[in-house]
Curated annotation (Swiss-Prot):
This is UPF0637 protein lin1053. Pfam families: DUF1054. InterPro entries: UPF0637 (IPR009403), UPF0637_domain_sf (IPR053707). Belongs to the UPF0637 family. It comes from the Bacteria.
Length: 204
């Protein structure tokens, strides 16, 4: 499909009651956009990183009762799976779109990564003021990257078994960057450029 951007309808899809109905909306309306966006950004990241990257689209297969509160695509260097590795995400809650560099609780190097970011503060200090962080990919709550929560979030990621660290940028449903499609792709590439140094540091 030709990607025309994200619309307010996409956010409303994440409010549809019921597992089956919401999953139908995600599969019919959102996932085709994820595939189109993801293929472009995967190609972009592969070229930028000099390493083949692979697209994964969340299937929510473990869901049996409650509908997913968010949905996403992930881009990772591992073709078989992304959750245990640093990876990039683009996804939606019902009230914002996110572009994250994500380290979720399955990550096997959380101690090393958190300690590196805590020690080498310049890596995160240089991020734009418009960026945000999150301690949990399943929760909507985010904090400004320079808002005073950074160290606590990194320490939780390091010390708590289910701790996570996500950093990037969020967009409200009426943000002009979400459409047309070419504008969103350009914006996403700019965000990824800011996150690539962190990604590389995490893999060292």
């Amino acid at each position: 499909m030709t990607f025309k951007g994200f619309s307010k309808k996409d956010f409303k899809t994440m409010q549809i009651p019921g597992l089956d109905a919401r999953m139908a909306g995600i599969q019919n309306d959102i996932q085709p956009k994820f595939k189109a966006v993801g293929e472009e950004l995967t190609t972009y990241l592969s070229a930028k990183l000099g390493d083949e990257m692979f697209l994964h689209i969340a299937r929510h297969q473990r869901r049996s009762v409650n509908p997913p509160e968010s949905t996403w695509l992930a881009i990772c260097h591992d073709k078989r799976g992304y959750k245990k590795h640093p990876h990039f995400q683009v996804g939606l809650f019902d009230n914002y779109l996110f572009i994250w560099l994500a380290f979720i609780y399955e990550n096997e190097e959380s101690t090393k990564i958190a300690n590196r970011f805590l020690k080498e503060k310049k890596l995160l200090a240089e991020l734009p003021d418009t960026f945000a962080i999150s301690p949990d990919h399943t929760e909507e709550k985010t904090y400004p990257v320079h808002g005073g929560q950074l160290d606590a979030t990194l320490k939780r990621f390091r010390d708590v078994k289910k701790g996570e660290f996500l950093v990037g940028k969020i967009y409200l449903p009426d943000d002009n960057h979400l459409s047309p499609g070419k504008d969103f792709i350009k914006e996403a590439e700019m965000v990824l450029d800011e996150l690539i140094p962190l990604y590389k540091a995490a893999l060292q």
